[in-house]
Amino acid sequence: QSLIETGLKQNTDLLSAAQNVKAAEASLMSARLAYAPSLGLSPQGTISSFDKNAATKTYSLPVTASWQVDLFGQLLNSKRNAQVTLKQMKAYRQAVQTQVVSNIANMYYTLMMLDRQLEITKATAEILKKNAETMEAMKDAAMYSINSAGVEQSKAAYAQVLASIPDIEQSIRETENALSTLLGEAPHAIKRGELEAQVLPTELSAGVPIQLLSNRPDVKAAEMSLASCYYNTNSARAAFYPQITLSGSAGWT
């Protein structure tokens, strides 16, 4: 549980997805503000003097305002596109979060499985070593018709099992490094329990209704991506039509 909490806070892919959500929120705010009139202020001031007379100060404050009439739906489609893009980014973030949790749990149980495999392999190697030593002693004592072929075969079995231990240890290190990267940390040893101590569910679900598939974040993201393409197309079509802008200006001098 602590590893999952760490991954949800520090995983780089999840942090990137969160930044994408913030960018989509900013784009939606910009699309909403496009409906509001735009105002412009350009205050000016001059000081002039002729023939050593008193200086004359002149001030002006022109104000301009313009408002685009969304007659053909360009602004509307841009806003809707921003809305579905925000939903898409949120669904993508949820999908990344689900994947991060799944990968952390999978690697954690893989490490415990490798630990158990290493323990069994070392115990097996010890048994085969004692077996080879016993057969060697029996051959030297000429007991039970033990020949050299049998002794060499037992030694070969021991050597084969012994040679597999470094491979398992390498797999453990690689899995720890991959899990550390997933947690957003430098490679280090992962503290973990034993496989036998884990409590697994006794009842497994047979499946989910097909209606619930629409709740999957990746399905939602794909749906919102399709909607975004639709609104982008409508906005591009509206751009072919003339834009109607109402503008006005006022000033004070």
Give the residues covered by each predicted segment.
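Amphipathic alpha-helical segments that line or abut small-molecule/effector binding pockets
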Residues: 80-84, 91, 224-227, 231
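Short, conserved glycine- and acidic-residue-centered signature motifs
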Residues: 75, 147, 215
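A small-residue-enriched
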Residues: 5-70, 102, 174-190, 196, ...
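Short, polar/flexible loop-turn hinges at active-site or ligand-entry regions and domain interfaces
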Residues: 71-80
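Periplasmic alpha-helical coiled-coil/stalk elements that build and connect Gram-negative outer-membrane
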Residues: 84, 91-208
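Conserved anionic group-binding/transfer micro-motifs
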Residues: 17, 82, 89, 168, ...
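Mature N-terminal segment immediately following signal peptide/propeptide cleavage
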Residues: 1
